[in-house]
Amino acid sequence: MKHYSVLKNEMIQALDCLKEDSILIDCTLGFGGHTIGALQAYPNIEVYAFDKDIYALNLAKERLKPYLQNIHFCHNAFSQFLDIVPNVVLPRVRGIIADIGVSSMQLDETQRGFSFVSSTLDMRMDTRADLNATKVINTYSPIRLEEIFRIYGEVRQSKKLAEIIAYERKKKPFSSCLELSTLIEQHFPRVGGIHPATLAFQALRIEVNDELGELKRLLHNIELAFDEGKIASCRVGIISFHSLEDRIIKQCFKQWSKSCICAEESLRCECGNNHAKGQILTKKPIIPTPQEIAQNKRSRSAKLRIFELKSSKDKGV
């Protein structure tokens, strides 16, 4: 199985803060590419590897057999890391990485209900979850569908798409991605080489897996762990694939870097001007090289942002 870990070298370079007894939290293990790269570069670290997708987790376990003594596999949502990683080892966490979004193997596996030609309409990364794409498409109101397509997919004709789906499902409920993608292709023209169902499928996947909510909870829990002193100095590197995710990460990192947290209308600082949690290490996001994009076209929209959390001790305060 061919697999490409997006921005792998750039992510590993960002982890040069790892020491011999450090812990790395890989929030999105996938096929294990970033974890393998980290363990090859820093062989004595310990990794807590998260993935909601049991299929991906089992494949990764096979691929990571040479490193099993260094890895704790966690079949959990990455936002739950504070409940899974023992408090006693949290101070050793020096890196937290995430590669947000669907993997190539999920897209290419037609039985998972992610691809345009899938015979199912599922899109769950965690098959234990109740909500799937079939329920969204066949039971959500046209108004709610329009919101999902417009907000999560930034679909230009979101209202038209929602109305077409609502009309067609009265005749026969949708049961496969192929049916849905074919319908979209019939009513909406291709733009360049991009399939007209791409953004609609993105929106459905985000809704089914609560992807933006998961990302926000992850960032909140990282901040919480840092503020409570459970995590000290640590690098946070997150790869995103569309503007909604990137905006959340960018705004969060910007907030973390602020020394002054007074209201904007304040005439002078009254907060002490010492609230920065660290510094942004990527003024502009790191993007794939032309060579990487040529090798893996799905990497073309990837952006990596890195933040360095610094405890008062490491700041010299």
Swiss-Prot record:
GO cellular component, one term: cytoplasm
Catalytic activity, as annotated: cytidine(1402) in 16S rRNA + S-adenosyl-L-methionine = N(4)-methylcytidine(1402) in 16S rRNA + S-adenosyl-L-homocysteine + H(+)
Residues that coordinate or bind S-adenosyl-L-methionine: 32-34, 51, 78, 99, 106
E.C. code: 2.1.1.199
Protein's cellular compartments: Cytoplasm
GO biological process terms on file: rRNA base methylation
GO MF annotations, alphabetized: rRNA (cytosine-N4-)-methyltransferase activity
Enzyme class name: transferase
UniProt keyword terms in alphabetical order: Cytoplasm, Methyltransferase, rRNA processing, S-adenosyl-L-methionine, Transferase
NCBIfam families: 16S rRNA (cytosine(1402)-N(4))-methyltransferase RsmH (TIGR00006)
Family: Belongs to the methyltransferase superfamily. RsmH family.
Purpose: Specifically methylates the N4 position of cytidine in position 1402 (C1402) of 16S rRNA.
Entry protein name: Ribosomal RNA small subunit methyltransferase H
